[in-house]
Amino acid sequence: MKYDLVVVGGGPAGLAAAIEARKNGVERIVLIERDRELGGILQQCIHNGFGLHVFGEQLTGPEYAERFINELNNLKIEYLTNTMVLEINDKKEVYILNQELGFRRIEAKAIILSMGCRERTRGAIGIPGFRPAGIFTAGTAQRFINIEGYMVGKKVVILGSGDIGLIMARRLTLEGAKVLAVVELMPYSTGLTRNIVQCLHDYNIPLFFEHTVIDIKGKNRVEGVTIAKVDNNRVPIRGTEVFYECDTLLLSVGLIPENELSRNAGIEIDARTSGPFVNESMETSIEGIFACGNVVHVHDLVDFVTQEAQRAGRGAARYIKGEAIDNGVVIRTVNGNGIRYIVPQKLRLENLNDEINLFMRVDNIYNNCRLDVKLDGKIIKSFKKRKVTPGEMETVKLKKSDLSTYNDCSLSIEVVKE
Amino acid sequence: MFDVAIIGAGVIGCSIARELSKYNLNVALIEKENDVGNVTTKANSAIIHAGYDAKPGTLKGKLNAKGNLMFDELCRELEVPFKRVGSLVLAFDDDEMKTLGKLYEQGIQNGVPELYILSKEKVLEMDPNISDNIKGALYAKTGGIIGPWEFTIALAENAVENGVNIFLSNEVVDIEKKDFGYRIITNKDTYDTKYVVNCAGLYADKINNMVSNNKMEIIPRRGQYYLLDKTVGNLVKYVIFQCPSKLGKGVLVTPTVHGNLLIGPDAEDLIDKTALNTTSEGLNFIVEVARRSVKTLPLNMAITNFAGLRARTERDDFIIEEAVDAKGFINVAGIESPGLSSAPAISLYVIDILKNIAKKIEKKENFNPYRRAIPKFIELSEDEKNELVKKDKRFGKIICRCESITEGEIVSAIHRNVGARTVDAVKRRVRAGMGRCQGGFCSPRVIEILARELGVEMTEIEKDHEGSYILTGPTKSEVQ
Ligand SMILES: Cc1cc2nc3c(=O)[nH]c(=O)nc-3n(C[C@H](O)[C@H](O)[C@H](O)COP(=O)(O)OP(=O)(O)OC[C@H]3O[C@@H](n4cnc5c(N)ncnc54)[C@H](O)[C@@H]3O)c2cc1C
Ligand SMILES: Cc1cc2nc3c(=O)[nH]c(=O)nc-3n(C[C@H](O)[C@H](O)[C@H](O)COP(=O)(O)OP(=O)(O)OC[C@H]3O[C@@H](n4cnc5c(N)ncnc54)[C@H](O)[C@@H]3O)c2cc1C
């Protein structure tokens, strides 16, 4: 099998990337999805709040996905569902498995990776205690409830105040369960402010900052969890333990980009994002292999995923047509004070159209601050912010003309308190 | 009426069952759990020890080295993952070098082949990730790693294939002495038998005390572990021990047979035989000790932690003997480490005791020593993969993405003669849910497949032990 472009993963990133590549003239495209249907994680996100930036309206996850799936069909882009990509390599060969075709090799001119991410587990954060049933990651519980139609518990404690945990607090409450508390290790939430208000405050669910779960009781099914306050080093403080009787513990303790395929292909991974290093076209360290969406870094808004994926789609089209420019000025992005990461990590100036959006996360909550953008040490732009938090991705839009330079150089962004 | 009833289907009970299935005997294997190997046998270091640890003259000393050498053939016959990677005991100072000398001597007396005392340079050449602070090491070439539950399941399957009757979810609550032998009463049924073999692990004392006035007491000794992701499974090439010392008795760092990295255990005597919980103290301790062995310990790659309980007795040795006041009642108790390594030799030893008691027992003519493992789809060649998918489409569908496990493998795990009934039983047989996402993605599908294949509701599927229900009911059942 031979294609110009293989897109791995049919979530919002893969869908938007495939559509954009077709609109930019790529003929033979195939999008591959291991699940029963397209749409990725959106299929289980039946709450609304999707698409404010892209469509200017509030859609549910499946509604947002549907618009892209319809467009994919209108553009007659081929796709395979129930098909797993098992391996890719630097020769741009893609190995797939499904029930009809069996194990097959596809040769591609370009590949776009959009495998999304997975959830961190209990093991990853090392909660001691028994190992009973009744411990779920929030996304797994969401799948059980919203797609399979089964309840996972009656009295629930949620660890982690990320968006998925917050949304599940509301969802469980609406389904008749009692959510006793949401417990957060850090002094701030990693979820969107609107979700804290709409999912916790509206239902009188308490949120405890600087607390964690230190023990799990129950040999067969969860019977309760012990919660304690932590000090500045995140170490539980003796004497602050409180036991909550419950049958379920939900974990919403972070997402990790799903990069096993990328890693095995030899693509370089940025330790800060856990996703591939990418350039302005979302191209990874292997020429002709692009990446977008949660596989690159974890996004909180799907609209940004879509924008980033469109960039990858255009980049892949340009690469396939031989129009990408690989010599010329290169600008590397560098984290300044207060910045945890910036994507893309590298900009090839000649390939920029007229502007570029940089995505980044800050490392703490800052009120009334500025984001200073420096090119080779000189401030070229400055953005005032009322509040930035690690829970909400920041974006900075730069014009190509802002970046006029004749040498390779670095662009840094830092948080400055006003 | 059974000839022999074995109580407890851990690695010891299953080993003995398989050995007995070579004879013309009517054998029952009675287990209180809903799966075999689901207590101590599923939570240990999974090491096939070489056999230099035990004092010469003890049963441990006799049976470990002998058992070790039986694994190649056994694992070939039963298609069980086993690797003789070799083990190293590290010494950090001159005192510990002396300890190595003692271990070496013990090993020779116990009949352990291929033991060497190596210099620091040689050790670091063999495995550069080992700490620079060592003085030397004892190298045992025969040390190995195994899949303990695969081994136990394979033994059970092969035993059943050869005629052993297995009764799961049957807890022995009483035993009566009768003229013909014993009547075993469980929470489900009664079983009459001429002879009893007590392999009840942590509860071997309870079973013994049902028939014997020679009371026994088992003390649970907990050991805790961290399991790390496959991306760091090759951190060390060998099983790395430290000298037994006050800091740590046997905290090891080892690759597992599946390519993960395992760190642990500590040792803590308890009273509660069900205390299979981990504690932050225990986990911190093993990390602290393990850090001495290797240059770096990538703990951020941890995917789970767990604990196991050793069945210790005051005798400090295996107890394998007929009870003095109960004819035909054989205790196989106090089987702490190296019980797994000794299991094949223990079963031969038990058969000898039985032969002495029963006088004439005959070998079967049609014993089949082979057991076919479930095909590991991802490890097959391209052609084999396609052939299998053509024959059975369910092999074309990946259910567990971390470990690349297909629906075909899961269905086959359910329909074996000792088939999986729970999500964790599937995991132990084919590794679905064993990977870095720990079932986050595949558990809903595994539940669906189990329910479909067993013809029950999704809500009836349990995670592991009885009572470990996962789903509480359909949605919208709580609000009217
Ligand atoms: C629970 C939850 C709630 C959210 N709520 C909101 C919200 O309210 N508003 C909002 O704007 N955003 C929200 N988001 C964020 C947004 O939905 C995600 O950022 C977005 O879905 C990510 O898109 P993606 O395409 O990168 O990944 P995904 O949607 O995860 O898609 C990845 C796809 O790749 C497939 N795949 C992976 N590996 C392979 C392989 N080897 N072979 C074949 N296919 C493969 C997967 O099956 C999946 O379908 C939420 C996210 C989550 C997880
Ligand atoms: C932390 C730790 C590390 C270890 N490391 C190693 C190692 O690396 N190498 C090694 O060789 N050994 C090791 N061991 C020892 C090894 O795990 C044990 O020796 C072995 O698993 C014991 O098997 P068993 O069959 O006796 O016990 P178990 O596996 O516990 O089996 C006993 C069975 O009896 C059943 N039972 C109990 N009561 C009843 C009843 N009333 N009715 C019916 N059934 C009943 C139980 O449910 C259980 O399934 C380790 C042990 C521990 C705890």
UniProtKB/Swiss-Prot annotation, chain B:
> Per the record, what are the reactions this protein catalyses?
sn-glycerol 3-phosphate + A = dihydroxyacetone phosphate + AH2
Binding-site list for FAD: 12, 31, 40-41, 45-47, 172, 335-336, 341
Keywords, in A-Z order: 2Fe-2S, FAD, Flavoprotein, Iron, Iron-sulfur, Metal-binding, Oxidoreductase
Q: Which GO terms describe its biological process?
A: glycerol catabolic process
Binding annotation for sn-glycerol 3-phosphate? 45, 49, 249, 310, 337
* Cysteines joined through disulfide linkages: none
Q: In which pathway does it act?
A: Polyol metabolism; glycerol degradation via glycerol kinase pathway; glycerone phosphate from sn-glycerol 3-phosphate (aerobic route): step 1/1
Its EC number is 1.1.99.-
Q: Can you tell me which residues bind [2Fe-2S] cluster?
A: 400, 402, 437, 442
Q: Which Pfam families match?
A: DAO (PF01266), Fer2_BFD (PF04324)
Cofactor(s) for this UniProt protein: [2Fe-2S] cluster
User: How cofactor binds (record note)?
Assistant: Binds 1 [2Fe-2S] cluster.
Q: Does the keyword Iron-sulfur apply?
A: yes
Q: Where is the active site?
A: 49
Gene Ontology molecular function terms on file: (S)-2-hydroxy-acid oxidase activity; 2 iron, 2 sulfur cluster binding; metal ion binding
Q: What does this protein do?
A: Catalyzes the dehydrogenation of glycerol 3-phosphate to dihydroxyacetone phosphate. Is probably involved in anaerobic glycerol metabolism. Active in vitro with the artificial electron acceptor 2,6-dichlorophenolindophenol (DCPIP), but not with NAD or NADP. Also displays a very low oxidase activity in vitro on glycerol 3-phosphate with O2 as the electron acceptor, but this activity is most likely not physiological.
Q: Quote the protein name from its UniProt record.
A: Glycerol 3-phosphate dehydrogenase
Q: Which organism is it from?
A: Caloramator mitchellensis
